[in-house]
Amino acid sequence: MADSGNPNENNPSTDTGVNDAVSTSHGDASASYDASAITVLEGLDAVRKRPGMYIGSTGERGLHHLVQEVVDNSVDEALAGHADTIDVTILPDGGVRVVDNGRGIPVGIVPSEGKPAVEVVLTVLHAGGKFGGGGYAVSGGLHGVGVSVVNALSTRVAVEVKTDGYRWTQEYKLGVPTASLARHEATEETGTTVTFWADGDIFETTDYSFETLSRRFQEMAFLNKGLKINLTDERESAKATAGADEAGEDEKHEVKSVSYHYEGGIVDFVTYLNSRKGELVHPTVIDLEAEDKDKSLSLEVAMQWNGGYTEGVYSFANIIHTHEGGTHEEGFRAALTSLINKYARDKKLLREKDDNLTGDDIREGLTAIISVKLAEPQFEGQTKTKLGNTEVKTFVQKVVYEHLTDWLDRNPNEAADIIRKGIQAAHARVAARKARDLTRRKGLLESASLPGKLSDCQSNDPTKCEIFIVEGDSAGGSAKSGRNPQYQAILPIRGKILNVEKARIDRILQNQEIQAMISAFGTGVHEDFDIEKLRYHKIILMADADVDGQHINTLLLTFLFRFMRPLVESGHVYLSRPPLYKIKWGRDDFEYAYSDRERDALIEMGRQAGKRIREDSVQRFKGLGEMNAEELRITTMDQEHRVLGQVTLDDAAQADDLFSVLMGEDVEARRAFIQRNAKDVRFLDI
């Protein structure tokens, strides 16, 4: 979540970021990986001047992208069958060390450069084993580009390679070698260690998020069967967290670490995602693998239906999450829809007069992982995360149809349960359509007939308009008085909306508060959703800064994630951050604090400046309704001063899992989540 604006401080601008770029090569994975396999395309000069072109941003996302680039190289070694363990360590001084047990970056001289291959890989853009075709058959990330970019954007890089019977080292400063490659003692071990320190003059922050890295590494471990990825945080802050809930002194010196290793690969991934979904429709995960060696194309699919109402199909190409789908997803969906309908009719589960099940009916409650690996992927779409290779659709459709036909024939009882669930979804869809038709006739879902309680803005330019979703009439009244009516709309809602995690679409559309939001946004919902019709480019959830307020926000986010996900993916959803305290030094001298820590810091700074504070000088806001219109305007609504958190979606599978835990039926999973994360909560307002 990215913050912008603050009445008390200047924050860095919102980090927009872009998705990882991807490059791969064709060739025989068993081909030699030596200096001759390294090819050079262009120089590295521009990277420090325009880092955003290479890593997307210089904010948090770009910083974590550096780690990803180095780890991608190690994963390439695993994909080629030469590595099975990757160790990532966040060092006490903020550096990051990545170690793998692969073959080691070659140290021989690259003929065209007259330098050791490892130095070329680290100092020349687009120099890497994938481009010439001799090093990797399939690879993900930006191998070659990534490591040299990491070098260019770091104050210091140290590389250690074990290869050709020796240990070799070299160091770099601001992308330039400080000395020649040095050969050390003989060793039979192989592998590469890259340690780097991101440049604080380039990045807005050099503080890595353990959670962000661990989520991505867990996903990578799921997608690379048998690969072990260890993440360790040696920073003092992590040590303090690790021992914060322990009585003994020794525990305070523990480091924070996680290890991910899945022999079942994506089968374990599906099991993990479905473990929070409640009852399963069938006990075993359906899995299949296939390969077309002539086309350097392979496929893995794992899938299982649960008793929930939402679809969770996630696709990957060369381990890169294809957020926008593509030909592999199209092939999967086409095979699934045609086969399930054919099977249902052959087994008389669908009668002659019944309509075919739609793809949405069939995929209700389905959790599936589709992972393809190919030599030359073509990426399309707005964020270059949509696979475009036409040959992939044909391959996936044929393989899924054949394997799933066999599974259905061998498991007739489970097959019948799957189809019955699809039929129930179809009945709900028909009921929802009738409900939509009825509400459309009444004008309840149409933006042409806006909800009566909406205080709309005057502008018709969606890019400038924003809507505040405010809980409670009193807060809604203050918000109406404090808004800029030219660009700011207010929609008050009453109480907590329906928990959509536990309801089908037909029931959801009957909820008045949800009807009001759908109508106000103008996009439609679910299968009728059209983001081009969005009336406000900022949707701001404004709730009290207490537990009830956070619960309301979670309910709203669950609805938006499940039924209007493109709003979240496109960065249109924000959380307001109203202050918790008002500190009054005098009649016209006051400051706002957004946490207990900030309150204490402001009071201490005031005392040091000689300011006097009375006992009644610190006002605690228990709700938005306690603020007058002017206070709400200054702290929460004024675009120049407010603090907003942008809701971003870097990992849909992880977000899906989190919403299932927080809002689903599994009470034990929710309790375990709270216990596991309680030590990370510094200020709990109950």
From Swiss-Prot:
Alphabetized GO MF terms: ATP binding; DNA binding; DNA negative supercoiling activity; metal ion binding
GO biological process terms held by the UniProt record: DNA topological change; DNA-templated DNA replication
Ranges of Polar residues composition bias in the record: 1-27
Substrates-to-products reaction catalysed: ATP-dependent breakage, passage and rejoining of double-stranded DNA
One Pfam family this sequence matches: Toprim
InterPro entries: DNA_gyrase_B_C, GyrB, HATPase_C_sf, Ribosomal_Su5_D2-typ_SF, Ribsml_uS5_D2-typ_fold_subgr, Topo_IIA, Topo_IIA-like_dom_sf, Topo_IIA_B
SMART domains associated with the record: HATPase_c (SM00387), TOP2c (SM00433)
Cofactor note: Binds two Mg(2+) per subunit. The magnesium ions form salt bridges with both the protein and the DNA. Can also accept other divalent metal cations, such as Mn(2+) or Ca(2+).
Its EC number(s): 5.6.2.2
Region (Disordered) residue spans: 1-29
Keyword Transcription among UniProt keywords: no
Lineage top rank: taxon: Bacteria
Localization: Cytoplasm
Primary localisation category: cytoplasm
Toprim domain location: 465-579
Functional summary from the UniProt entry: A type II topoisomerase that negatively supercoils closed circular double-stranded (ds) DNA in an ATP-dependent manner to modulate DNA topology and maintain chromosomes in an underwound state. Negative supercoiling favors strand separation, and DNA replication, transcription, recombination and repair, all of which involve strand separation. Also able to catalyze the interconversion of other topological isomers of dsDNA rings, including catenanes and knotted rings. Type II topoisomerases break and join 2 DNA strands simultaneously in an ATP-dependent manner.
Recorded family membership: Belongs to the type II topoisomerase GyrB family.
Name used for this protein in its record: DNA gyrase subunit B
Gene symbol of the encoding locus: gyrB
